[in-house]
């Protein structure tokens, strides 16, 4: 079942905003960070239809709010539609998001799919629902993006999510990878964007409190947060308390990769290093030896 979507024609998003100086300072910071992310990774272009995935949590509310404000002032034209996947979790307040969208004149869909029952059936006893749930959720949302003609799918992951995913893969997956700010989905049909990539979680928490978003808890399914991710999140929070610049440095490292300083042979051709070494022209014997190797290689061709 889909809720009717209002047209972006005559778009009139003018919510009641806080008036405190703290709010406007934070808003300015978030706008700047989101704007830089959009520009740096070419996330949104003229004519795009951006599908914003809204769960009812602080991250997706903040993402939607900032993008809607950008739409009002952006020098390009793009459309926004909010989409919520109602997974039929017990106790899910079905009226909260429709009311919020309608009160703020936001075009939206409510996509109803009982992925909760499927998740319960497929999850082994004693395991958390998160892995299966997220796969089913992604599949449903990505397919729906195709149905409505969305050119970009906006997700609410922030800087700390990206860093946490990096450490999850490092500690438990044996790989150096995180969440890219922009990604082509595995089926090659959707462009995923994360406009909050430069935003810290603590700023999102403050912003959501100031804006008084009607937050829907994410643990309605009764499952506990993935233990490994929970431990890493706590580690990151402790680091941020003790060493305020550490997370900034880690995120910077994700943007400053040197393949030649790692050990991945698919990223760097270590076999050609000998041929790239500068010759010592002061040593005639060494020069003759190197030239003989080059001549032999040409003769072989």
Swiss-Prot record:
Note on cofactor: Binds 1 [4Fe-4S] cluster per subunit. The cluster is chelated by three Cys residues, the fourth Fe has a free coordination site that may bind a sulfur atom transferred from the persulfide of IscS.
Positions that bind [4Fe-4S] cluster: 130, 133, 221
Lineage of source species: Bacteria, Pseudomonadati, Pseudomonadota, Gammaproteobacteria, Moraxellales
Keyword Transferase applies: yes
Record's subunit section: Homodimer.
Domain of life from the UniProt record: Bacteria
Gene Ontology CC annotation, any one: cytoplasm
Gene this chain is encoded by: ttcA
EC number: 2.8.1.-
Catalysed reaction, written as an equation: cytidine(32) in tRNA + S-sulfanyl-L-cysteinyl-[cysteine desulfurase] + AH2 + ATP = 2-thiocytidine(32) in tRNA + L-cysteinyl-[cysteine desulfurase] + A + AMP + diphosphate + H(+)
One GO process term, biological-process aspect: tRNA thio-modification
Protein name in UniProt: tRNA-cytidine(32) 2-sulfurtransferase
Short name of one Pfam family: ATP_bind_3
Places the protein is found: Cytoplasm
SUPFAM superfamilies named among the record's database cross-references: Adenine nucleotide alpha hydrolases-like
Keyword annotations of the record: 4Fe-4S, ATP-binding, Cytoplasm, Iron, Iron-sulfur, Magnesium, Metal-binding, Nucleotide-binding, RNA-binding, Transferase, tRNA processing, tRNA-binding
Pathway: tRNA modification
Function, as annotated: Catalyzes the ATP-dependent 2-thiolation of cytidine in position 32 of tRNA, to form 2-thiocytidine (s(2)C32). The sulfur atoms are provided by the cysteine/cysteine desulfurase (IscS) system.
Cofactor(s), by name: Mg(2+); [4Fe-4S] cluster
